[in-house]
């Protein structure tokens, strides 16, 4: 094994899979160099079943080439683009923190309201990053016409040190693309779409301004701007529905903040803010008039207050990755292995009864999976389960059924493991 807990993936060591979506897997990884140089990064790797689809691979590569041209403190940095065996990947900046779709609910559960002034501070940084991307030019001064098209709470990340990053310019549209997205194709999260996006029209940067307005509206009022029983109902609401002033839901919304939101949310884009810089200027003007303006330090302290347990678990995971020289793993290429454990602190597998425990006895006299002891800390802490899989068809099938039965968080990874082994066994 080339390094602790993971597999060599070119010049990188994969440490843990931290997310998976329809398009790609995201791995926490380490880049190593001369004289002990190390850098923690993220690897975004196309999922195996998509690597053979030529059109998708081309879209992925075009996305990476576009995103790699963005270099701004408010945008996640792309470091590398490559292919190892049949796996295409992007190496990108690792940001220890949480996205806003997790921060606000976590604060609410802790009984700590998320201050509106913090929401405005974050939105100002989003505006700055968007304006940079929207006005980005190539080496010859030609505009790239970048539009993010998916500004949502999930794509706005705040690090533990209080810095804000826009993530996933993955469905950005630019003239640099080899093939333009079909005109009527709708992408992005429905509830934050601009009216022109919902109608499948050609987009420009003002669509992102509307989406940010929808996000900020939700943070300020506590209500999602567009809702509906199904996708068509949401789209109809975006196109035809009335947008109520924020004070309709929350009486104490300052008049200046309400003006900012209503201008950003103009359905006619000609009446909207014409640049993200204009929106940022109005937000910053309001913040300057307040008795208190939050800094990155204030945001950092707020996050540490509500995420203290998760921050410690992530530190422990990184330290453990350094200590452990060998880990049970799955094959990834020639003699490359990856441990089956996710960063979020959930077990890969529990016992057949649903309670964490001994994994040796799955089904009475049925197939057995050899295991090392499982250690359990206090409720909600990281549950470690290390498995050594016996390479027999019955045992693998039993493990597959167990993962399916309990709908475990890393089930996609378990499925891929089992499919790979079953294919190998013939």
Where are these regions (language model features)?
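Short, basic amphipathic alpha-helical segments that act as recognition/interaction helices
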Residues: 408-426
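Surface-exposed, Lys/Arg-rich phosphate-binding patches that contact polyanionic backbones
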Residues: 393-412
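Short Lys/Arg-rich basic patches
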Residues: 364-391, 400-403
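Short N-terminal regulatory/linker segments that flank and modulate the kinase catalytic core
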Residues: 1-16, 36, 110, 286, ...
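Conserved ATP-binding/catalytic core of the eukaryotic-like protein kinase fold
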Residues: 1-244
